[in-house]
C-alpha cells in the first residue's frame, strides 16, 4: 500500500491551533505550501497531504483510488491525517479545510467526526441529481474495461461543464481562476489536470450523490464557513450554495456562514 505524502508546516512561535488541508481533484499538496506558510505566521500548524490517487507517490496511477469503494479510501485518508496532527498537538483548537472535491470529502467525513473548532469549505461543489446516473454508468464501464481505464464521456460528465461555463476561454481550465498565472501553473504541472480513471470518476460521482445523505450532527454548534468566488462554476451559483448550506442545516448544523467574493472563480 502506497504511503500518503504529507507535510506539517509549523509556526516559528507557539502553536495556537491546527488545520488539516484537503486539496481538490487533479492537484496535489505542494500547491498549498504558500497557503500553509501564511497560516503558520498566525500560529497555526498546517498539515497538507496528497490524497490517494494524487501527487508524486501516485504519479503512475493518477486518478485511481481503489478497485472498489474508492470514496471510502479518500474519506479514510482525512481521518488518518486528522489523527496524526491532533496527536501531535492535543491541547489546541483543531480546524479542517477542504477545497473543491476536498470539500466534498470533508462534508462526508463530518458524519464520522465533527469534533472541530471550525470547518472551512472552499469552492464547495453542490449536489448533482445526475450523479447517481454517472455512478452507475461508471460502474458499468469499470466492469467492462477495468478500473484503470479512462473514458472521455465520464470526464466530460464530471468536469466538462466547468470549461463550458467560461466564454471565450483560452484554455480548457480557465474556469479555475481569473488569474492567468494560476491557470498556467496548473497546465504546466505534470501532476495536475490528469483525468480520473473510470473507477475514480465512479468514486467521485458516489461522493457527490451522498452529499444529500442525512445524518445527525454530533457537534451542532460547529462553526462552518463557506468561501467561494462568485463566478466559480463548481458551486452551482447561488442556488447551489443555498442547497449545500441547507443540507448541512437539515443535518443539525446551526452555525454556518458564507462569504462569496465578487469577480473571482
Write out the residue ranges for each language-model feature.
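Active-site glycine-rich loops that stabilize anionic/oxyanionic intermediates
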Residues: 23-27, 100, 230-231
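Conserved alpha/beta-hydrolase
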Residues: 29-62
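Alpha/beta-hydrolase-fold enzymes
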Residues: 106-191
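Short beta-strand/loop motif that positions the catalytic acidic residue
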Residues: 226-228
Amino acid at each position: 500500500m502506497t504511503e500518503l505524502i504529507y507535510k506539517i508546516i509549523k509556526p516559528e512561535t507557539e502553536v495556537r491551533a491546527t488545520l488539516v488541508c484537503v486539496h481538490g481533484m487533479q492537484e496535489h499538496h505542494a500547491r498549498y505550501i504558500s497557503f500553509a506558510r501564511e497560516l503558520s505566521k498566525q500560529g497555526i500548524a498546517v498539515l497538507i497531504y496528497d490524497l490517494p490517487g494524487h501527487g508524486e507517490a501516485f504519479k503512475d496511477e493518477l486518478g485511481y483510488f481503489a478497485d472498489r469503494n474508492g470514496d471510502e479510501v479518500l474519506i479514510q485518508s482525512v481521518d488518518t491525517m486528522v489523527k496524526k496532527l491532533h496527536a501531535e498537538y492535543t491541547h489546541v483548537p483543531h480546524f479542517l479545510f477542504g477545497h473543491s472535491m476536498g470539500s466534498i470529502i470533508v462534508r462526508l467525513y463530518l458524519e464520522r467526526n465533527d469534533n472541530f473548532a471550525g470547518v472551512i469549505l472552499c469552492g464547495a461543489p453542490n449536489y448533482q441529481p445526475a450523479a447517481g446516473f454517472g455512478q452507475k454508468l461508471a460502474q458499468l464501464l469499470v466492469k467492462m474495461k477495468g478500473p484503470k481505464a479512462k473514458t472521455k464521456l465520464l470526464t466530460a460528465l464530471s468536469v466538462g461543464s466547468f470549461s463550458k461555463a467560461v466564454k471565450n476561454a483560452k484554455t480548457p481550465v480557465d474556469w479555475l481562476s481569473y488569474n492567468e498565472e494560476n491557470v498556467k501553473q496548473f497546465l504546466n504541472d505534470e501532476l495536475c489536470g490528469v483525468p480520473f480513471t473510470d473507477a475514480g470518476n465512479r468514486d467521485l460521482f458516489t461522493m457527490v450523490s451522498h452529499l444529500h445523505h442525512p445524518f445527525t450532527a454530533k457537534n451542532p454548534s460547529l462553526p462552518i464557513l463557506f468561501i467561494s468566488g462568485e463566478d466559480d462554476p463548481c458551486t452551482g451559483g447561488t442556488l447551489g450554495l443555498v442547497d449545500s448550506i441547507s443540507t448541512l442545516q437539515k443535518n443539525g448544523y446551526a452555525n454556518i456562514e458564507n462569504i462569496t467574493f465578487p469577480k473571482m472563480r
